């Protein structure tokens, strides 16, 4: 009787050990699945962040190139406007010179006309 109780007790302990081992393996498998799922979820976020960073880097390079082109074009426009401004000043200078010459010519013409009229009046008729 004692040996039968001992065998039953050992059998129940073996069943409990097997059940405990089975549950331990299931817990390890579940923990592994959870870990893999978490890693996959984090990897998706990291991959997305990496792709976004690459896109941002590309956009920054494009923006730098366009900003440099804009600066160059702006410099060219400034040069053209300065040249145009200088040309307008020169045209204004020529216009003032022409007015001055015209005024001098009118003065000379008036003086010559005055002298001519004076000579006609003083000439014996």
From Swiss-Prot:
Reactions catalysed, as given in the entry: L-lysyl-[protein] + acetyl-CoA = N(6)-acetyl-L-lysyl-[protein] + CoA + H(+)
Segments passing through the bilayer: none
Pfam families, sorted: GCN5L1 (PF06320)
EC numbers, comma separated: 2.3.1.-
GO MF annotation, one: protein-lysine-acetyltransferase activity
Record's keyword terms, sorted: Coiled coil, Cytoplasm, Lysosome, Membrane, Mitochondrion, Transferase
GO BP terms: aerobic respiration; anterograde axonal transport; anterograde synaptic vesicle transport; lysosome localization; melanosome organization; neuron projection development; organelle transport along microtubule; peptidyl-lysine acetylation
Gene Ontology cellular component list: axon cytoplasm; BLOC-1 complex; BORC complex; cytoplasmic side of lysosomal membrane; cytosol; early endosome; mitochondrial intermembrane space; mitochondrial matrix
Coiled coil: 1-31
Subcellular location per the Swiss-Prot or TrEMBL entry: Mitochondrion intermembrane space; Mitochondrion matrix; Cytoplasm, Cytosol; Lysosome membrane
Leading EC class: transferase
Subunit description: Component of the biogenesis of lysosome-related organelles complex 1 (BLOC-1) composed of BLOC1S1, BLOC1S2, BLOC1S3, BLOC1S4, BLOC1S5, BLOC1S6, DTNBP1/BLOC1S7 and SNAPIN/BLOC1S8. Octamer composed of one copy each BLOC1S1, BLOC1S2, BLOC1S3, BLOC1S4, BLOC1S5, BLOC1S6, DTNBP1/BLOC1S7 and SNAPIN/BLOC1S8. The BLOC-1 complex associates with the AP-3 protein complex and membrane protein cargos. Interacts with ATP5F1A and NDUFA9; involved in their acetylation on lysine residues. Interacts with KXD1.
Function: Component of the BLOC-1 complex, a complex that is required for normal biogenesis of lysosome-related organelles (LRO), such as platelet dense granules and melanosomes. In concert with the AP-3 complex, the BLOC-1 complex is required to target membrane protein cargos into vesicles assembled at cell bodies for delivery into neurites and nerve terminals. The BLOC-1 complex, in association with SNARE proteins, is also proposed to be involved in neurite extension. As part of the BORC complex may play a role in lysosomes movement and localization at the cell periphery. Acts as a protein acetyltransferase. Negatively regulates aerobic respiration through mitochondrial protein lysine-acetylation. May counteract the action of the deacetylase SIRT3 by acetylating and regulating proteins of the mitochondrial respiratory chain including ATP5F1A and NDUFA9. Acts as a regulator of mTORC2 signaling in response to hypotoxic stress by mediating acetylation of RICTOR, thereby protecting RICTOR against ubiquitination and subsequent degradation by the proteasome.
The protein, known as: Biogenesis of lysosome-related organelles complex 1 subunit 1
Source organism of this protein record: Mus musculus (Mouse)
GN (gene name): Bloc1s1
């Amino acid at each position: 009787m004692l040996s039968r109780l001992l065998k039953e007790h050992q059998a129940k302990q073996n069943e409990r050990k097997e059940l405990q081992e089975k549950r331990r393996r299931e817990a390890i498998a579940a923990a592994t699945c959870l870990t893999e799922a978490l890693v996959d979820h984090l990897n998706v976020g990291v991959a997305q962040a990496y792709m976004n960073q690459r896109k941002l880097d590309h956009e920054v390079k494009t923006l730098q190139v366009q900003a440099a082109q804009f600066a160059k074009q702006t410099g060219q426009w400034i040069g053209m406007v300065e040249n145009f401004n200088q040309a307008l000043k020169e045209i204004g200078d020529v216009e003032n010179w022409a007015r001055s010459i015209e005024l001098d010519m009118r003065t000379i013409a008036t003086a010559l006309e005055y002298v001519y009229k004076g000579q006609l009046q003083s000439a014996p008729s």
